[in-house]
């Protein structure tokens, strides 16, 4: 049972979204944003506001950036392996985060 938590506050959420937005804007092939339900939806909305790119309900493999809250086991990423652009707010392996991640909109 996981008893340790890594809590992301709103300020950190916004800073992470701003970093992702800058990365997205550097790629002129990205035309819209698709948020994976449920965790990716708040991120997709924030990124849409920051980049002024529209949200989409029907992602396209080469022009849509797929966004999710966290990359842990990689199973969700595998589901979107045919998509060129895939971004997450938290990559547990790259960041060496072992705790359970709690986002600002979640209860502990």
Roles of regions detected by a PLM:
Residues 1-108:
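PRPP-associated nucleotide enzymes
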